[in-house]
Amino acid sequence: LANQKGGVGKTTTAINLATALAAIGERVLIVDLDPQGNASTGLGISRTDREVSSYDLLVGEATVAEAAIMTSVPNVAIVPSTMDLLGVELTIAEHGDRAFKLRNAFKQLGDLTINEKPVSYILIDCPPSLNLLTVNSLVAADAVLVPLQCEFFALEGLSQLLQTIEQIRSTLNPRLSIQGVVMTMFDKRNNLSEQVLHDVRSEMGSLVYDTVIPRNVRLSEAPSYGKPALLYDLKCAGSQAYLRLATEVIRRERQLNAA
């Protein structure tokens, strides 16, 4: 999940999409690559429980199996983030394989099981910038999911992200595709939300998911309780939207694999 703009619902989407995928039978690993560690906090992982983190993964001091922690969400594990990530670029900058650190770590993924079964989805929560952490994510990923808020300037910066994705695809990861664009923070009472949604769909076409994530109080409240919205209030509009998004993601992935 990538977007160099902050505040677009990226971490909220990572947490709740993972939970929704798990609810329909998938086994999901989240890799928190944002030094702020909001995905880790939002899943109830305290700072003291992050003895091994995504930093250790990138510098080669831990395997995915060693870094992953089971969360309170059934079938969801996370490789948590710490503030150490702020210095990881300096640590690996001189390494010839600096863009491939995460991909190399994933080569040992077979060691990790969730409830004795292999992981079926890995969701990488990228930082809100196009830095080496995001490049590592794009090099390691099969596809990119782009959260975009239904607010003015939503498309600002998107062209730069799409250009970066194309550069990664042409040089470092030819299998990389765009899974889709998910519109977040949609307010049906607001004409601007409708206009932005229309503009983005006109610009991006079928890449935009049918599911739109509403602006929802429960989605905002849930992280302060260390829970995804689906565990905090399953019936709220936000939770139901993420369940629909999960089914769309699975359907699109099957279409991409069949292509």
Where are these regions (language model features)?
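P-loop NTP-binding core
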Residues: 1-259
